[in-house]
């Protein structure tokens, strides 16, 4: 009855699909040709008609798929019965090889069977992929149907509102009708796809199973053919060797060259046997890889099929996790690459032996006589046998190389399948509970599991595994070497302590402190801390090699997993010694370091064994003890981590450094509080059943902190190097200044006293020089680089479980319309896209802040650039980063440039009118940065302002005048107004001085005085040369003009001061008085009578009115 109802529904849907009217494609094609040939061109009409044709083509494809789905529904009983009958009729035994087949026939049969096997394997894989695609589509079909119906309703609404009879309206009508027909066919197709999904999936599974069985039979038959071929080749080689050896036994005194051929043939025969064995092993590895790939694919399909039921059952999650845990490990392709390279080398050797055979026929006896007939017959038999062996080895080598290539491909497929399973595990199982929530009976479960663990013959397995580890060559040698390394470390510990004391004594002394001391301390500290972790790793390796004892292997996995943590903790303890790296070299306070290492013994004695036990329970008996003993270990680990983290916070270790390099900021406190609260949240998550999720997140969080601490150590190492360099430079300058002072003092004393003075022996003060003020810009650059490295490292670390956050892609926030090749479609903007956009904006902000400084300090300052060019490059780089980051970030949330450009254009026009002055200044700033009419450091005069350019921004330029006042000038003024740049291409400027001289002075003498003063002035340049001219005679005074040149604007005022002093000194030396402007004074008597005397400025009287 159910089958009849399904058939009727499918028939109704298919009838609706076929009955849906659609425009005639021929008519649309004719209209399109006419539109293309029309004058003038009609691009909108052409685009609409072309869109209609594309929609009709898609409709045709949907109709074909509807027929296929309908056939599957109608013929499913018959098709499934046929496939099951074929499966039941297949023989379990493979085909037998005919014993009378020759070598050539076997080779030909092997080629044919290999081709058939490849086809069947490909067919099985295709059917598996088809079944997986059908399973994946089941979750997407409802949403696709909803979207298609919504689009269809929108098309129908637009069809109802379309009016007009123009060619464009008709073309748009054709496009809408075609889209409507396409969407109707698509809705029917999706309905039938959903109805026939189970049938199609079952048929694909049956076809895949049938192809897999056929491929297994072909593989067994192919292996039998290869075994038969190898056996024939070995038999022929052995017969040939026996016959030639029989001839050799009957002949005596054979030459050495013939005896050597016997040895070579035996070696070639042994190589042929080894090649046959290796080919059998490769074939078995191929079968194993194929079966493992099938197992992984089945686990992947099971995981995807059962993913929708994970939220309703914890047992299902546990079962799926156990199934994933039983999957094989990732293959190692490096071994195959090495073997393939060795095969190619062997092939060259065999070809060389073949090429040497003509030369071997020309050998002679030891006395130079030619070979006898018997010896020639033996030699020919040997060479014939050798040639057959070499040909067999070459053919077998090529076959083995081909099989190794197939094995490599199979391993690659297995690796891809394992990656897909890993991604699917993170996607579907990461946020599902893997153990039952804790109840009141949980302590009883712990006691029962502990009793059960002891009853598993634990100590006996460990004892037998230890005996196996001590008796195996593969494990005893590394263990013995690790013990020797530990002994050497204990013996050399006192030398290391003395080295630390000597190094610490030199730290801070200018002439003895070197950066090499810090590097040596870093290297030896890491080396001294390594022996115990190496021994721990060796023990783990030995236990993992004890494969007959699962408990020992699980413990070995736990021991190996704790090696990095143990090594890091021991390195930190070595760094924290009183004379170690942290205190003596970095200058960290001893109390802070002691507080940070307060729980060192707890880390070694509690956290490391607990992590080892946790990993052991995760790898033992399908995680049988994870819910009880494993969860207990994890809770204890979280508690210990919270205590250790609190201790590190109190020690003042920074997780975030601000611009000043200080960790005392709110971001640092927030990060530490998050780190303290993370283990407590993990305890709560494990209590409610999310043990594996809590483990993965907490492990990556703590690893992120470890990465940051490593970069913090690197930062302080670089900081110490900068401190040493700065301190040494300052000390060299101090010595130079002291030497100059002593030299000046010595020049004022007598020679005898100079030799007898105790100051002649200069003692260099080697006390510590307090120069801790390192370049803030360099340190800021280092912090920026390390922050970017930390960000990238954390992104790579967390990207391993990025698929676990795939649920964010299912949380749709809003929809946007995107147009691709003229077809509009709705795309949802998810929460994951928004978070990625926020991350892009954060990275862009960091790059904008730090990358220009990185360019300036790392690259630009080492280039020979004109003033201001570096600033222009960094500014343009900053704007480009902002533009690219903005476009990428906005595109993540659906705001594409194709939509944004119109808004930008409209805003540009509107703001251009409303804020035209600001936009003019902005554009002028860009012009200034590119054309560079002014640069930072130039001296300019604009309007009535003169000063030096100190800053060029995109809106305004800052000028500092001679009064040290900062003047903000809009950039538009430098583009639209006239201004003077005193130092654009040539910083040399002319200074013109007007010098008066008395009328009775010799003009040539005055000219020489002025030129001499100019030549003696230290700020006057020689080229162009100074010039003096007698330019005027005013009221009995000679007016001279001195024209001199200064190298830069800053020299103009000091030059005037110095040249005036030199001119006054020159006039005084030559007895020339500086004249002053003439004036006349008329004297009147006290009683009002006029005396008739007039005094000139020179004090000489003359009659009024006289000349």
Swiss-Prot record:
Subcellular location: Cell inner membrane
Membrane topology: Multi-pass membrane protein
Signal peptide: 1-19
Name recorded for this polypeptide: Miniconductance mechanosensitive channel MscM
Gene3D superfamilies reported for this sequence: 1.10.287.1260, 2.30.30.60, 3.30.70.100
Biological role: Mechanosensitive channel that protects cells against hypoosmotic stress when highly overexpressed. Gates spontaneously in response to increased membrane tension.
Keyword check for Secreted: no
Protein family per UniProt: Belongs to the MscS (TC 1.A.23) family.
InterPro entries, per database record: LSM_dom_sf, MS_channel_1st, MS_channel_C, MscS-like_channel, MscS_beta-dom_sf, MscS_channel_2nd, MscS_channel_C_sf, MscS_channel_CS
GO MF term set: mechanosensitive monoatomic ion channel activity
Transmembrane segments: 467-487, 522-542, 551-571, 600-620, 628-648, 674-694, 698-718, 785-805, 828-848, 875-895, 910-930
Subunit structure, interactors included: Homoheptamer.
GO cellular component: plasma membrane
Assigned keywords, A-Z: Cell inner membrane, Cell membrane, Ion channel, Ion transport, Membrane, Signal, Transmembrane, Transmembrane helix, Transport
Main localization, broad class: membrane
Domain of life: Bacteria
GO biological process terms on file: cellular response to osmotic stress
């Amino acid at each position: 009855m159910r089958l009849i109802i399904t058939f009727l529904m499918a028939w109704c849907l298919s009838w609706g699909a076929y009955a849906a009217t659609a425009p005639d494609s021929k008519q649309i094609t004719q209209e399109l040709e006419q539109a293309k040939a029309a004058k003038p061109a009609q691009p909108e009409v052409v685009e609409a008609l072309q869109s209609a044709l594309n929609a009709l083509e898609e409709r045709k494809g949907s109709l074909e798929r509807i027929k296929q789905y309908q056939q599957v529904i109608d013929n499913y009983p018959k098709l499934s019965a046929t496939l099951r009958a074929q499966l039941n009729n297949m023989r379990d035994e493979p085909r037998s090889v005919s014993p009378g087949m020759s070598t050539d026939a076997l080779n030909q049969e092997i080629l044919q069977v290999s081709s058939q096997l490849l086809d069947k394997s490909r067919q099985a894989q295709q059917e598996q992929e088809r079944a997986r695609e059908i399973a994946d589509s089941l979750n997407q079909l409802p949403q696709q149907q909803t979207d298609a119906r919504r689009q269809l309703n929108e098309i129908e609404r637009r069809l109802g509102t379309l009016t007009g009879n123009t060619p464009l309206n008709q073309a748009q009508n054709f496009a809408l009708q075609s889209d409507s027909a396409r969407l109707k066919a698509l809705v029917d197709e999706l309905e039938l796809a959903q109805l026939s999904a189970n049938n199609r999936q079952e048929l694909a599974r049956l076809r895949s199973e049938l192809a897999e069985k056929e491929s297994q039979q072909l593989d067994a038959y192919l292996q039998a053919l290869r075994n038969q071929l190898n056996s024939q080749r070995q038999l022929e080689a052995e017969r040939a060797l026996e016959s030639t050896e029989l001839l050799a036994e009957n002949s005596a005194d054979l030459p050495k060259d013939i005896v050597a051929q016997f040895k070579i043939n035996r070696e070639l025969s042994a190589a042929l046997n080894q090649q046959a064995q290796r080919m059998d092993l490769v074939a078995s590895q191929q079968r194993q890889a194929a079966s493992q790939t099938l197992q992984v694919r089945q686990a992947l399909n099971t995981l995807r099929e059962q993913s929708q039921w994970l939220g309703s059952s914890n047992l299902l999650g546990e079962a799926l996790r156990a199934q994933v845990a039983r999957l094989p490990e990732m293959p190692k392709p490096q071994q195959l690459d090495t073997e393939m390279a060795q095969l190619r080398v062997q092939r060259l050797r065999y070809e060389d032996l073949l090429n040497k055979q003509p030369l071997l026929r020309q050998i002679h006896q030891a006395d130079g006589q030619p070979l006898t007939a018997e010896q020639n017959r033996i030699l020919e038999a040997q060479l014939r046998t050798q040639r057959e062996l070499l040909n067999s080895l070459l053919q077998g080598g090529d076959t083995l190389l081909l099989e190794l290539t197939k094995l490599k491909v199979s391993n690659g497929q297995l690796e891809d399948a394992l990656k897909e399973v890993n991604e699917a595990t993170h996607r579907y199982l990461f946020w599902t509970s893997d153990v039952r929530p804790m109840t009141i009976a949980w302590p009883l479960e712990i006691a029962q599991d502990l009793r059960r663990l002891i009853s598993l013959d634990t100590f006996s397995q460990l004892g037998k595994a230890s005996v196996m580890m001590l008796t195996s060559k593969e494990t005893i040698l590394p263990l013995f070497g690790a013990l020797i390394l530990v002994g050497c470390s204990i013996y050399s510990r006192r030398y290391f302590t003395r080295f630390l004391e000597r190094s610490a004594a030199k730290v801070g002394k200018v002439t003895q402190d070197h950066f090499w001391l810090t590097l040596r301390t870093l290297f030896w500290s890491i080396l001294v801390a390594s022996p115990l972790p190496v021994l721990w790793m060796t023990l783990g390796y030995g236990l993992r090699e004890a494969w007959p004892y699962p408990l020992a292997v699980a413990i070995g996995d736990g021991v190996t997993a704790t090696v990095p943590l143990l090594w890091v903790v021991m390195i930190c303890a070595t760094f924290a010694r009183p004379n170690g790296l942290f205190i003596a070299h970095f200058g960290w306070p001893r109390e802070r370091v002691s507080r940070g290492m307060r729980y060192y013994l707890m880390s070694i004695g509690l956290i490391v064994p607990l992590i080892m036990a946790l990993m052991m329970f995760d790898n033992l008996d399908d995680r049988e003890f994870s819910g009880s003993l494993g969860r207990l270990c994890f809770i204890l680990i979280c508690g210990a981590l919270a205590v250790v983290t609190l201790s590190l916070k109190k020690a003042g270790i920074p997780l975030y450094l601000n611009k000043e390099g200080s960790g005392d900021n709110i971001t640092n406190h927030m990060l530490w509080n998050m780190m303290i609260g993370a283990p407590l949240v993990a305890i709560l998550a494990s209590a409610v059943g999310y043990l594996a999720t809590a483990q993965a997140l907490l492990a990556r969080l703590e690893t992120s902190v470890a990465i940051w601490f490593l970069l913090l150590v690197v930062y302080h190492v670089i900081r110490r190097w900068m401190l040493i360099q700065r301190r040494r430079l300052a000390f060299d300058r101090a010595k130079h200044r002291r030497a100059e002072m002593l030299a000046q003092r010595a020049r004022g004393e007598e020679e005898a006293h100079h030799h007898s003075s105790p100051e002649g022996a200069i003692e260099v003060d080697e006390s510590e020089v307090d120069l801790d003020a390192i370049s803030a810009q360099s340190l800021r650059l280092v912090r920026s680089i390390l922050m970017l490295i930390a960000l990238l490292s954390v992104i790579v670390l967390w990207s391993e479980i990025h698929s676990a956050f795939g649920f964010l892609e299912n949380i749709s926030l809003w929809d946007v319309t995107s147009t691709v090749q003229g077809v509009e479609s709705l795309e949802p903007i998810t929460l994951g896209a928004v978070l990625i956009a926020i991350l892009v904006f954060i990275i862009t902000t960091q790059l904008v802040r730090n990358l220009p400084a990185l360019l300036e300090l790392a690259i630009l300052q080492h280039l020979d650039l004109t003033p201001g060019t570096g600033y222009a490059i960094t500014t343009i780089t900053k704007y480009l980063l902002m533009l690219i980051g903005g476009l990428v970030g906005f595109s993540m949330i659906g705001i594409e440039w194709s939509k944004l450009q119109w808004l930008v254009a409209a805003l540009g026009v509107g703001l251009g009118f409303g804020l035209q002055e600001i936009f003019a200044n902005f554009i002028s700033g860009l012009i200034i940065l590119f054309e560079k009419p002014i640069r930072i450091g130039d001296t300019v005069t604009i309007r009535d302002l003169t000063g030096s350019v100190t800053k060029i921004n995109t809106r305004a330029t800052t000028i500092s005048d001679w009064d040290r006042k900062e003047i903000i000038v809009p950039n538009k003024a430098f583009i639209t107004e006239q201004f003077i740049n005193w130092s654009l291409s040539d910083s040399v400027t002319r200074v013109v001085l007007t010098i008066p001289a008395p009328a009775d002075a010799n003009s040539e003498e005055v000219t020489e005085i002025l030129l001499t003063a100019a030549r003696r002035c230290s700020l006057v340049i020689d080229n162009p040369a100074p010039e003096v001219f007698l330019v005027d005679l005013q009221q009995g005074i000679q007016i001279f003009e001195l024209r001199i040149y200064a190298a830069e604007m800053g020299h103009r005022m000091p030059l005037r001061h110095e040249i005036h002093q030199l001119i006054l000194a020159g006039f005084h030396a030559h007895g020339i008085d500086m004249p002053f402007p003439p004036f006349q004074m008329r004297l009147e008597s006290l009683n009002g009578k006029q005396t008739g005397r007039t005094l000139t400025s020179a004090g000489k009287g003359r009659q009024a009115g006289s000349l």
